[in-house]
Amino acid sequence: GGVDSTFLAAAAYRVLGDKALALTACSETFPEWEKKESLSLADLIGIKHVFVEASELNNKDFRKNGPDRCYYCKKERYSVLVQWAENRGYNWLIEGSNADDLQDYRPGLKSLQEMEKVRSPLLEVGLTKEEIRQISKEWGLPTWVKPSAACLSSRLAYGLYITPKRLAQVEKAEEIIRQYCQGQVRVRHHGNIARIEVEP
């Protein structure tokens, strides 16, 4: 349901039609409102859509919540998605990393590049986030103005053990604040302290 993945789903559907299938990995790190948004965006595009159950919390290195957390998250999540796709006869899984991601610290990207069955076409052709937003606008995709998003585990300070309870606390807090604020809302979990970030 993000800017890049929605654009990629729309592009895949334009090229492949009903041969394309959008997958959304559902886990404790994925907020409920994003699940609903994924469904509505798939309906808007016209692409078939399936939720696939995954759990990054199965990985102890992910739960430790170090600076390489995203590496273990992507590894766990995409291993499940690749297995699901292969079992149903799909040759490739494509995901929405873009050219700008090469400029940032992205340990998750490293894990994707280690997977033979995962491709990142937006990155491979050099599309930037701004270009993706512009084309999304031209295609009438509402996500062209959507703020950047990250999974709930990114709200927990490094070193703070990731648990279902802490993820649920963040999701509930953001849900309440979102009733009063437009745009991006993030509640940073620092154990006994929460730091709220909203757009001005």
Specify the residue positions occupied by each region the protein language model found.
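ATP-dependent adenylation/nucleotidyltransferase module used to activate substrates
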Residues: 1-138, 194
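AMP-forming adenylation/ATP pyrophosphatase catalytic core
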Residues: 76, 109-200
